Regions:
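Conserved RNA-binding domains used in RNP assembly and mRNA/RNA metabolism
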Residues: 2-87
Length: 87
């Protein structure tokens, strides 16, 4: 998925308003950032399901931890760096 597809998914948004997540298998998924995701001290929910429901971000901790759930109930612990998540 490239930034053109990101714009297609989130029409009218800049790329810096979209959170990119790269999974272990190299697939990338994208999620809209909520306004307070990097400033709230508590976990905030990102209310956006992408890729037709296959992947869903259920919560993100601004202190650099996020969790992704897949439909197969697998979870991945991810690290947040400069607005992007990496496994």
């Amino acid at each position: 998925m490239n930034s053109g597809l990101v714009r297609e998914l989130f029409e009218g948004l800049d790329d810096d308003e979209v959170l990119r997540i790269e999974l272990i298998n190299g697939n990338k998924i994208y999620c809209l950032l909520s306004d307070n995701v990097f400033v709230a001290p508590a976990i905030v929910k990102i209310m956006k399901t992408i890729k037709k429901g296959k992947y869903q971000i259920i919560m993100i901790d601004p202190n650099a931890i996020a969790v992704i759930c897949t439909m197969s109930r697998e979870t991945y612990d991810l690290k947040l760096q400069r607005g992007e998540l990496y496994v």
